[in-house]
């Protein structure tokens, strides 16, 4: 068995502690929210916020995150078993569940498309403004300003 350096062990333990602390905080928040919200989603938002605010550096969580991503299929096994155990309930409400999935997908696609068009439209307008500025500046250099 390969001997792990003390630094690697410390790094792994620190990363596990960071993830555990974030999940503990997200579980506490989830139990106190008036609406049902998965603690894992809250944890992702907290982790993302801490990374954006540079409270936590990417290097402090990157290797454990990569390792967990590598075994993500295994981590979904309990969720799959829960879905299989709930097939009776899902069969009872199949039409409602299917309707929600279809409507949510259509809304998501529409909002994503509109947002992309909005962003691309702004980008094209900025590109046109820059081209117009270059033409005006070029005219000024040659003394052709209207």
From Swiss-Prot:
GO terms classed as biological process? cytolysis; killing of cells of another organism; programmed cell death
Pfam name, any one: LrgA
Ranges that cross the membrane? 9-31, 35-57, 64-83, 93-115
Report the superkingdom from the record: Bacteria
Would you tell me the Gene Ontology cellular component terms? plasma membrane
Keywords (A to Z) from UniProt: Cell membrane, Cytolysis, Membrane, Transmembrane, Transmembrane helix
Q: Where in the cell is it found?
A: Cell membrane
The membrane-topology field of this record reads: Multi-pass membrane protein
Q: Which InterPro entries match?
A: Antiholin-like_LrgA, LrgA/CidA
**Predominant location:** membrane
Can you tell me which family this protein belongs to? Belongs to the CidA/LrgA family. LrgA subfamily.
What this chain does, per the entry, is described as: Inhibits the expression or activity of extracellular murein hydrolases by interacting, possibly with LrgB, with the holin-like protein CidA. The LrgAB and CidA proteins may affect the proton motive force of the membrane. May be involved in programmed cell death (PCD), possibly triggering PCD in response to antibiotics and environmental stresses.
Protein name, as recorded: Antiholin-like protein LrgA
